[in-house]
Each structure stands twice: as C-alpha cells, then as structure tokens.
C-alpha cells in the first residue's frame, strides 16, 4: 500500500496516465486507454490500492473476485491476492476447459458469448465483478447472469472507467462503482 498519498492524489495520477486516442476504433470515438496507466509502475500500484481499498470498505463480504475477458483479468488477480481471496475469469466462448455455463449478450455490432467454469464459484459465494470499463453495461449484465447460473451472488460491480453518457449503469442491478467517470 501507499499510505502517504491521498486517494484523491492517487486517482489524479492514474487519470493523468490514461491515454486518449481520437477517432479510434472508428471516426467520432474518443478511445480512453487504460494501458497507459498500466505501463507506469506507480500508476499500477495506485490503481491496485484504490480498487483494494474500495472493496475493503464497500464489499468486505466478498469471497471471489471475477475479472471479465480480457482487461478485467489485469485487475482481478491483483485485487484477489492483496485481499487473500479467490479469483476467477469470465472468458469469451471456447477459451475455458472443463464444464462451463454460457450466456449470450448483445454488442453494438453483434452478439458475443461469455463463459464461466461451473466449478469457479460455489453456490452462495459472494462475488465482486471487475472490469476496466462500463460503457453500455452488456458485459456486466452477462457476467451477473453467469455468476447467478452457478449460484454465486454478485455483491458489487467495480470498474476503473465509466462512460456515463452511454448509461450502462441503468442496466445493472445492485451496487456499481467506477473510479473514473467520463
């Protein structure tokens, strides 16, 4: 942990490292890229601290941290190891071995499928879902449905960045927290 720096200062530092790419992936889109922050060791530590501290305060009952394919994976292991919790991935179709449950969800350009290993979460376990971005909310809705299919209980969805204008939060039930809102 980095106790000598305030949470606000840590967040400001992380924000300063997020890249902005106009007209990517298509004309008229301003793409905000978390990888700029992840290439900076200090920003990585601050980001971990902010996520972990939030879960300690908001979801201390959490037992499993689930990361969404693929950028959510960058955070769930960091958080889980710091808190001494289990972690599990939700992956795109065909990427997980063993018995899985699946759910289809809509994208702005089509349909995709998420999968979760049936053994990853025990019935009744309390789960925090982590991803880099909340946009339309489709992936977090699908993740919540998958976790429910294996008997897990989502206690919170936690994202690094939220694109508020897309109103994805309105599609989600339960607690949702974003570190940065655009």
UniProtKB/Swiss-Prot annotation:
Any one biological process term the GO annotation gives: AMP salvage
Pathway in which this enzyme or protein is active: Purine metabolism; AMP biosynthesis via salvage pathway; AMP from adenine: step 1/1
Keyword annotations: Cytoplasm, Glycosyltransferase, Purine salvage, Transferase
Enzyme Commission number: 2.4.2.7
Catalytic activity, reaction form: AMP + diphosphate = 5-phospho-alpha-D-ribose 1-diphosphate + adenine
InterPro entries from the UniProt entry: Ade_phspho_trans, PRibTrfase_dom, PRTase-like, UPRTase/APRTase
Subcellular location: Cytoplasm
Gene3D superfamilies: 3.40.50.2020
GO cellular component, one term: cytoplasm
Pfam families for this protein: Pribosyltran
GO MF annotation list: adenine binding; adenine phosphoribosyltransferase activity; AMP binding
Cross-referenced PROSITE patterns: PUR_PYR_PR_TRANSFER (PS00103)
Stretches that traverse the bilayer: none
Function: Catalyzes a salvage reaction resulting in the formation of AMP, that is energically less costly than de novo synthesis.
Record's subunit section: Homodimer.
Protein family (similarity comment): Belongs to the purine/pyrimidine phosphoribosyltransferase family.
Protein name per Swiss-Prot or TrEMBL: Adenine phosphoribosyltransferase
Originating organism: Drosophila melanogaster (Fruit fly)
Lineage: Eukaryota, Metazoa, Ecdysozoa, Arthropoda, Hexapoda
